[in-house]
Regions:
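Conserved HGGG/HGGXW glycine-rich cap/lid loop of the alpha/beta-hydrolase fold
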Residues: 18-63
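Conserved alpha/beta-hydrolase catalytic His-Asp/Glu region
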Residues: 157-224
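Short glycine-enriched nucleophile-adjacent loop
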Residues: 101-112, 118
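Active-site loop/oxyanion-hole signature of alpha/beta-hydrolase fold enzymes
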Residues: 55-95, 99, 125
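Catalytic histidine-centered segment of alpha/beta-hydrolase-like enzymes
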Residues: 263-276
Length: 293
C-alpha cells in the first residue's frame, strides 16, 4: 500500500503496510537514518490476531526514493495530523518509537477526547549530535548545507552510512546484540540509507533539525498535558543520555512504565515478544471516557 501526502506543493508517496483485523492501531517507526516501517513488522505480526494495524514510513525516510526538501519539524507535525485526520481516524492506540513518540505526544497534548492509548517506545526528542554534544552547535547548519550540495553532499553522506558505519551505529545505540544487524536485516537497512534522496532527512535528523522540542521541560510538560493513557517502554541497555530522558518521563504522574531487562533504542525490533507482553495488557484496558489531564 502507498499513501499520498501533499506537502508544500509536492505529492509524496510513502510506504505503508496493513495487517490484521479488529480495533485500529497505528504504528510509527523511529526517525533515524536506518529506520523504516519494516522495524514495526514484528509487532504488527503479534498484533494482527487482535488488531487492524497500519505501519507507515515517515516523509523523507523509508526505503523508497525521496525528494530533496528542507525537512522541518513543521512537516512532521503536519504529517501526524494528516494520518490521524485522514488515514487512521480515531485509532484505538498509537505505538510510536523514538522521535515519532514525541511527535505523537505533541499532537495529543492539545487533542480532545476520545484519544487513543499511547505506547511510547524508547521515546527521544533530541537528535544524535545534540545528544552527544549536549546541545546545538553552529556547524550543524553548515553540515546540512554541505550534505545538500550535489557532488560533495552524496560523498560525505556515503562515508557516514557505509556498511561498517551502519553496523557500528547499530551496535552502539540501536541493538543490544551486535550480531542482530546482519544478513537480510543488514541488507534492508542498507537499502534504507542508500535510497535516492535519503541524505536530506537523514542529515537533518542527525544534526537535530528535526527535533520536535527544545528542552526536557517541554518534553515532560507534553506528557502531563496529554489527554490519553500513556505507556512508556524502554530497554535497560538504552544509551545513558537517552535513557536519562526516558527515566525523567517515567517519573511524570500518570505515565505507566515498563523497563525491559534488555534492549537499546530499537527494543521493539530486537525483542518484540517482550515488548508485546508489555503492550498487550495495556491495549485491553477500558479507555477513560474523558480527558484525565
Amino acid at each position: 500500500r502507498t499513501l499520498e501526502w501533499n506537502w508544500r506543493g509536492e505529492t509524496l508517496r510513502l510506504g505503508a503496510d496493513a495487517s490484521g483485523s479488529g480495533p485500529k492501531v497505528l504504528l510509527l517507526p523511529a526517525l533515524s537514518s536506518i529506520s523504516s516501517r519494516r522495524e514495526m513488522h514484528p509487532l504488527q505480526e503479534r498484533l494482527a490476531p487482535r488488531c487492524s494495524t497500519l505501519a507507515v514510513d515517515w516523509p523523507g525516510f523509508g526505503d523508497a526514493a525521496r525528494p530533496q526538501m528542507d525537512w522541518t519539524p513543521d512537516a512532521y507535525t503536519a504529517f501526524v495530523a494528516f494520518l490521524l485526520n485522514s488515514v487512521v481516524e480515531q485509532p484505538h492506540a498509537i505505538i510510536a518509537a523514538g522521535h515519532a513518540a514525541t511527535y505523537v505526544l505533541k499532537h495529543m497534548a492539545d487533542a480532545s477526547p476520545p484519544t487513543p492509548q499511547l505506547v511510547l517506545i524508547a521515546p527521544t526528542w533530541r537528535g544524535p549530535l545534540p545528544t552527544m554534544l549536549g546541545g546545538h552547535r553552529p556547524f550543524f547548519d553548515r553540515l546540512c548545507r554541505l550534505v545538500d550540495r550535489p557532488g560533495i553532499g552524496p560523498l560525505i553522506y556515503r562515508l557516514n552510512v557505509n556498511r561498517l558505519a551502519v553496523r557500528y551505529m547499530g551496535a552502539g545505540h540501536v541493538y543490544a546484540d551486535p550480531a542482530f544487524l546482519a544478513g537480510e536485516r543488514l541488507r534492508e537497512k542498507l537499502a534504507v540509507v542508500r535510497a535516492p534522496g535519503a541524505r536530506f532527512a537523514s542529515v537533518r535528523f542527525v544534526t537535530g533539525r528535526l527535533d520536535p522540542l527544545a528542552s526536557r521541560a517541554t518534553f515532560l510538560d507534553l506528557a502531563r498535558r496529554a489527554a490519553a493513557p500513556v505507556l512508556l517502554i524502554y530497554g535497560a541497555e538504552t544509551p545513558p543520555k537517552s535513557r536519562a530522558e526516558m527515566e525523567a518521563l517515567a517519573a511524570v504522574p500518570g505515565v505507566r512504565t515498563v523497563r525491559l531487562p534488555k534492549g537499546k533504542l530499537s527494543v521493539h525490533e530486537e525483542f518484540p515478544d517482550a515488548t508485546m507482553q508489555a503492550i498487550a495488557p495495556f491495549l485491553t484496558e477500558e479507555k477513560p471516557s474523558a480527558a484525565t489531564g
